Amino acid sequence: MSRVSEYGVPEGVRESDSDTDSVFMYQHTELMQNNASPLVVRARPPAVLIPLVDVPRPRSRRKASAQLKMQMDRLCNVLGVVLQMATLALVTYIAFVVHTRATSCKRE
């Protein structure tokens, strides 16, 4: 008879490494050698949600408001530069088209 550890799991039995399983799977060494299916012992405890990104939170509303205002100012500056570049590109394109049409009309 096999010995039982302090957690109630027989020796030679290990926990599955897969996080996608919905149950804890304990596999006995002999079962693994004989290519037999693993034994399901008990259900998995509830999962703990871990945030993907740890965003530091300001301690006060005033700091949060100031941080939000600073981010909005940066965003507005970037959008302003993008709008200026798009306007410049459009004006340049229109000037090029007008110039090419004017020169092609003179040739005829």
UniProtKB/Swiss-Prot annotation:
Taken from the record's topology, the Intravirion segments are 1-77
Q: Which UniProt keywords apply?
A: Host Golgi apparatus, Host membrane, Membrane, Phosphoprotein, Signal-anchor, Transmembrane, Transmembrane helix, Virion
Name any GO cellular component annotation: host cell Golgi membrane
Q: What's the PTM story here?
A: Phosphorylated.
Report the main location listed first in the record. virion
Write out the similarity annotation.
Answer: Belongs to the varicellovirus ORF1 protein family.
Question: Can you say what this protein is called?
Answer: Structural protein 1
- Organism, scientific name: Varicella-zoster virus (strain Oka vaccine)
